[in-house]
Amino acid sequence: MEAAIKTYSRLRTGGILFFAFLLSSCGSSNKAADQFITMDTDTLIEKVAQVPASKVKVYNFWASWCTPCLKEIPEFEAFAKAHAAEVELVFVSLDRKKVWDTAVLEVVEELEMTQPIWLIDQGLDFEWRHKIDEGWVLPAIPVTLMTYKSHRKFFMKPLERRELEEALLELQTL
C-alpha cells in the first residue's frame, strides 16, 4: 500500500495502452474493461438519484492524490466482498481526465481494486457536489454516500470497516 500512497506522476510501462484497451472495450464482457465507466457530472447525479431497491448502494468518492482515500480503499473492498449479496460498491474517481490512464490506473492496479470505478469528467463545474448530497459543503474527499430504498447516509470523512458495518445495519433496519 505504501507504493500506492506515493505520488503517481510517473507513467507505468504500457499504462496508456492498457487503459486505452480498457476504455475501448467497455461494451465487451471483459471484467477488467467493464470495471471502468466514464461519465459527466449530470449522468453521475442521475445515477446516484436512482433509488436502489434490493441492495445497499455505496458510492465512495476518491482521488489518486488523496492519502486518506487510498488508505480506506482496502477497507471498502473487504466490506463489499463480505457483503456481496447485500451491497453494491462503486468507487467514484474525482481525478482529472489527464491522469485517468496514469495515476488512476496505477492506484487500481496497486490496490487490486475489483469494484466498479466511475471516472467523472467534471470540467470546471464544482457545484454538482451539492446535488449528490446537501451535506457536501466543502470540496473535500474522501466522501461516501450509502443509499437504500429512500434512506441515505452521507459521510464527509475517511471511514473504517466498523463504520461501514454500522451504517449498513442502520440502513437495513430503517
Identify what each model region corresponds to.
Residues 2-15:
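Bacterial N-terminal signal peptides that target proteins for export
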Residues 24-25:
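C-terminal motif of bacterial Sec signal peptides marking the signal peptidase cleavage site
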Residues 36-56:
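A short beta-strand-turn-helix
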Residues 55, 62-65, 96:
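Short pre-active-site segment immediately N-terminal to redox-active cysteine/selenocysteine motifs
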Residues 61-75:
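Conserved redox-active cysteine motifs that mediate thiol-disulfide chemistry
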Residues 74-111, 125-129:
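Structural microenvironment flanking redox-active thiols in thiol-disulfide oxidoreductases
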Residues 107-141:
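Short, internal strand/loop/helix patches
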Residues 141-174:
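Thiol-/selenol-based redox modules, centered on thioredoxin-like
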